[in-house]
């Protein structure tokens, strides 16, 4: 039973063995990882951030997503000339621009700079932190909370002093960045802003 003759031999039918499907892999941002993880050709749209630490944190959490979408994150090195830089970039429906600035407080220089840009293909968002370090949850790096530093004192130096850390800011940044393994280690306001910027620039119309 269960046998049949094929080319003179008795053979049996067997169900094809299927590889067991494991759970979907997730990226650090919480997205389902794509099977094809090769980077795509960069799209013309861009995301600009103010500092290298901002760029490194975004790469740490959203790097896989950005490479898959073909979105490049570039460092502004200061936003004083933002309006002129936006004009030079020439945003349009095929080439959108997302900008992440430090906290935009009413009446601040950054707020005035952002107000100079009025273009439907540009989205400017901020995060509510004095420094991008604060966007990392204290618990992720083993502290109760980020220390308060008086206005006028260097924030990074003040934090290191109050935490009793002897390292210089660049070394401490590498340490705390290494503690970030996913979006769960980052404060919600930054997560929301970055996700909105990615959604905005990836929604640009394809070029003909």
PLM-predicted stretches and their roles:
Residues 1-208:
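Acidic, divalent-metal-binding catalytic cores of TOPRIM
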